[in-house]
Amino acid sequence: MNSEEMNHVNPFEISDNNDVSIPSQRYPFANDPADSVFCADDFLQSYGEFNMDNFGESEPFIDASGAINAAIGVTGTVLGFLGVPFAGALTTFYQKLFGFLFPNNNTKQWEEFMKQVEALIDEKISDAVRNKAISELQGLVNNITLYTEALEEWLENKENPAVRDRVLQRWRILDGFFEQQMPSFAVKGFEVLLLVVYTQAANLHLLSLRDAYIYGAEWGLTPTNIDQNHTRLLRHSAEYTDHCVNWYNTGLKQLENSDAKSWFQYNRFRREMTLSVLDVIALFPAYDVKMYPIPTNFQLTREVYTDVIGKIGRNDSDHWYSANAPSFSNLESTLIRTPHVVDYIKKLKIFYATVDYYGIYGRSGKWVGHIITSATSANTTETRNYGTIVNHDSVELNFEGKNIYKTGSLPQGVPPYQIGYVTPIYFITRAVNFFTVSGSKTSVEKYYSKKDRYYSEGLPEEQGVFSTEQLPPNSIAEPEHIAYSHRLCHVTFISVSNGNKYSKDLPLFSWTHSSVDFDNYVYPTKITQLPATKGYNVSIVKEPGFIGGDIGKNNGQILGKYKVNVEDVSQKYRFRVRYATETEGELGIKIDGRTVNLYQYKKTKAPGDPLTYKAFDYLSFSTPVKFNNASSTIELFLQNKTSGTFYLAGIEIIPVKSNYEEELTLEEAKKAVSSLFTDARNALKIDVTDYQIDQAANLVECISGDLYAKEKIVLLRAVKFAKQLSQSQNLLSDPEFNNVNRENSWTASTSVAIIEGDPLYKGRAVQLSSARDENFPTYLYQKIDESTLKPYTRYQLRGFVEGSENLDVYLIRYGAAHVRMNVPYNLEIIDTSSPVNPCEEVDGLSHRSCNVFDRCKQSISVAPDANTGPDQIDGDPHAFSFHIDTGTVDSTENLGIWVAFKISELDGSAIFGNLELIEVGPLSGEALAQVQRKEEKWKQVLAKKRETTAQTVCSGEASQLTNSSQILKIRNYDLIQNFRIFSLRNTLSIKFKIYTITNYPYSRLNYDLFMELENRIQNASLYMTSNILQNGGFKSDVTSWETTANAEVQQIDGASVLVLSNWNASVAQSVNVQNDHGYVLRVTAKKEGIGNGYVTILDCANHIDTLTFSACRSDSDTSSNELTAYVTKTLEIFPDTEQIRIEIGETEGMFYVESVELIRMEN
């Protein structure tokens, strides 16, 4: 063929003639047929770029491989270490992380992050800003290196105080650095250019705050400081996230335009910033180890798109996005999928044609369209068509059960046949290799045209433009089929035809992260996260940028369903939902059609507000559930929902430990006790009531002493301290109704009963019956003395009423303030325990105090239609509150404050308790003026009455008073001498001698009994003298013991007995011991009423043992003759420290302790 003939060849002939036979070569460039036509120089002139490198290459003006490698490596490393790591894992984690961020302990990688964004948006960071950022980053490198070195040393040697102090010091320096220098990475005007630097620095800061929460207690941080650091972790997570999302959107918006080249840059920015910024911030919630204390299967379901498979040349005219390219909007709407559920490719059928240039010697295959079959996690399938799929040959690739972890593509710009004219006018995809893995087996599926002159057997596996150049693996230390970071999940396509000039057929590959699990496995040992896009029957909308994937939206009452595969059906789980909503309602969960959870949710944002980080919240379901089937369906639904949208980020399935209920009780108790105190922990919050403290104490007592002995002791001390604070501020005398109708207590009518053991009250409550008749009401009252009051001060009466009808409450000072309370008896006690009597047979006796409820297995249900009023606390109709104000305080007048309860009706009743009268604070403003007016009016009325009384006396109209002598009633008590043991021994010896003289010869029969008794007395004497506790028999009152209120020594039947009459009473003594000896703790005591009494012994190493006494318990370590008698219990201990502490307390009722002995064992 001569030159003239060649000039008549159609350079662009598209052929689908199956009869054309074209010889094939596997490696076309080894023996290019063009060389037989042209000399080398001619070939280079006409096909100047006809070599492997230029058939398809990366965009020449951006090289972000180093930055992307580091960003993907950071994300992959964090995903692998979520939860609370053990020491070795934490060291490995930081080593891997710093390998990506600080290779060679310098800032080179961070400079790459800056260059990456500069190239993406074609702007430059000023030298001043760059130099300052690099300087601060070098400081970060130095500080974080010192911290991690100290941390590693401490993890290996936690017992060394110097090492501990060093790591804490280094952490504080590093934390201060972050707090001070983070603004340097967000300089005004350069926020987008510094965005990747800011993101990675923020990530490190949050990781360091996570360390402080995990290890803070061991470093010596106070609980308050640990909580403050946790609060900062949450606050900075929101702050850093909102910053990153805001400036990501700003940078992306700046790249919007109308042409294809702008879209090319736009898509690259979106992809690379997703990898470097959005993926990182999506993991921030997982740093909260309160929420994620165990490994978590976190999934990034977002999709990223690699570059269009189109030729990129050396000149603008050689690029696919040059002349006759689709518009920006056309590319975006055609190539980028709308929000959808997660899917993966099952089959891909590619249709191809051939392009003839330079006759049959330049024939190439050309991808012109495809049919893609996708499957979802719900096993549903969908088929979509792209491009031209009729009248063309095709190749079908089956990817069932395979992950496509890499592609190698051959895009080509085909030039016309014309000497010296090398501008391509036809852009095609000539061949693609799909690299797959299934289990450990790898394979390569190939698309190619058998009619292709040079690639009739496909593209060699080592050639092409590889997807890993844009989506590198998580690590280079492992093979790509193991360490790959992304899977191919979809292929879109766009075609532009303009005759035979500048026509383009362009596929686009869509990828999801390798963390996505298509089978929805539910793991028994880690938290399973199911994003909203892993379900079906769910509406999917675009994510706000920080979730890690698109989110769900309710469709009416329907939120979606999830098909899951449960590894262990015997394991219990609980659910947690991350959501945002503008309304309130109930969220329910079904498993295989049965409702297992139904909880109320609260609104998280106002209508119209954007979906920010703080707009999302968690709804945690505490009730554990089981799956009945290995393959199950979870359904989420809404109930009682008003208008508004419910957004669903995802559902989390959390394995429940075998001791989950106990752990939940511990957390509830911690929360309840913490809520009682101000931030300083030394005072009660002003709105905390005595009833709330009692309920918190009930929660503490339900904590498992076997699992959480230390925590229980600490919380019990805290709640007792709260009770002491409550009692110290309570101006009422005898609020527990222990001494009604006695001095300094309440005065009550005979129809008032004191009740104990009511499930609603921890202490005693009072019951008022109806009036006997209209002249004899039921009443209860007391006066608070003037000496305890302050001038111009507001006081508040508070309490808890189980129910009342026609109950009048009076607060009296300047006249009577009267309120009638009618509170429904609508509190239902739900007992979840089996109704058994634990004392049906105890030594053949029964006891009414044993038939009691278990506070740890009860809940209180309140009717939802209960009316609330202005004098109720937090809208609870059963918690009441009334106030009264004082004016001037005059001890001579001694007005005081009278508190009275009265029922005058024949159909009245009331049960109430936890009464308290507390000081609220000084009066001011209108309240002050009002009490001054009231006091002045009262004084005028009083003066007038006194004047009238004086006139009456002077006129002789007053009745004569009869003075009768006062009769004093003196009770005589028989005083019984409390002999010591040696006195008892002497008395016994004398009596035995008299018995021997007077009863001989029968006395010999009792001699053995006498000797046995004498030996026992002698041994008891030895025990008494060897008791290392001071005043263990309470002969000297409570000397040597630390005591609180409601604990006193009484003389009962001639013995000194320690009596605890309230659950907050505490008696304790610390003693020195020898840690190379064993000791016997022996306690003689008895319990009356409900609840338990206990004697706890603990050492400085937090080893705790407890002897428990109950009115209905008979244990193996107990010696007793009858149920109500004193029992003696013993316990052997072997302390590890040189000091131990004995603590005596009770849960409720009365506890009597006759003696406490701690005796050292002899070898």
Swiss-Prot record:
CDD domains: delta_endotoxin_C. InterPro entries: Cry1Ac-like_dom-VII, Cry_V, Galactose-bd-like_sf, Pest_crys, Pest_crys_dom-III, Pest_crys_dom_I, Pest_crys_N_sf, Pest_cryst_cen_dom_sf. The keyword Kinase does not apply. The keyword Aminoacyl-tRNA synthetase does not apply. It holds the Pfam family Cry1Ac_dom-VII. One of its GO terms (molecular function) is signaling receptor binding. It comes from the Bacteria. Keywords: Sporulation, Toxin, Virulence. Toxic segment of the protein is located in the N-terminus. Belongs to the delta endotoxin family. This is Pesticidal crystal protein Cry26Aa. It comes from Bacillus thuringiensis subsp. finitimus.
